[in-house]
Structure formats: structure tokens, C-alpha cells
Amino acid sequence: MERATFAAGCFWGVEAAFSKVEGVISTKVGYTGGTLKDPTYKDVSTGSTGHAESIDIIFDESVITYGELLEVLWNTHDPTTKDSQGPDHGSQYRSAIFYHDDAQREAALRSREQLERSGKYDSTIKTEIVKASEFSPAEDYHQKYFQKLQFKR
């Protein structure tokens, strides 16, 4: 099993998208890229901790590659906006790829460059590519949020 960590705006929708992908074993939403140890949603919402709402993915590379997960990421959000996605604004909603090893870093750089050259967007890609730091899981009520909403209906 391999691990991938991405940020692409509000983590609820990102988790919903990745949880449906064949080869994804598990997803967990949380916070990464910041300075505060064990941040809460309230902490991260201030925009002062440096954390991004993110998703930690465990996947089976014999079923889906890291490169294919990057394609899902690019199609899940607008990578040309800085610190915002849709109605959500602030550095906690930034677009980022948190790589876990050199192979992931290289794949992310290549993928971002290919997307830039594709002409799909008029603006430049703002997605950060940074070394993964500690991932802190979000509170339970954030986990599988959209799935929980479906069960309540």
C-alpha cells in the first residue's frame, strides 16, 4: 500500500471524490502543512496555523498509480486559484500536493508541468508541491462527511 496527501479546497468534497476511485483503500481528512501540533478545525479556520485542509489517501498501486491519483486531483478542483476554492477563501483552502518521497515529487512536478502546457487553463497553476509534514486527522464529524449526509436522508 502507498500513501498520497493532497489539498484542494474544502476537504469534504475532495474526500467524496477520492473515496469513489477504484484502488483507493481508505481516505482520511485532516490538516497538514502547518506549525501547530494537533490542530483543530477551529485553529485551522483562523488561517494562522499554516495548515491546509487535506486528505490522506492509502491506495493500492497495483490498481491505481500515483500519477492517476494526480489526474483525479487536477479534475477535482481549480488549481489556478490561490488560497480559495469556490466559496471558501483562506490559506487553509489552498491547492497543494504533499509528496512523501522523491518519486512522488518528480511525478507531481511532471504532472503540473504537463497541465500547464496543455492549455486547459488561461491562468497559471497555483498548486504548491511541498514535502509532506505531519498529518493531523480532523475531528470525527468531518470524516466521510458527505457519506454521512446521504445516510441521514
From Swiss-Prot:
Family matches, as Pfam families: PMSR
Enzyme Commission number(s): 1.8.4.11
Keyword Protease assigned: no
GO molecular function: L-methionine:thioredoxin-disulfide S-oxidoreductase activity; peptide-methionine (S)-S-oxide reductase activity
Active-site residues from the entry: 10
GO process annotations (BP): protein modification process
Keywords, alphabetical: Oxidoreductase
Coiled coil: none
Oxidoreductase found in the keyword field: yes
Top-level EC class as recorded in UniProt: oxidoreductase
Family annotation (SUPFAM superfamilies): Peptide methionine sulfoxide reductase
Function: Has an important function as a repair enzyme for proteins that have been inactivated by oxidation. Catalyzes the reversible oxidation-reduction of methionine sulfoxide in proteins to methionine.
Homology family: Belongs to the MsrA Met sulfoxide reductase family.
Cross-referenced HAMAP family: MsrA (MF_01401)
Protein name: Peptide methionine sulfoxide reductase MsrA
Underlying gene: msrA
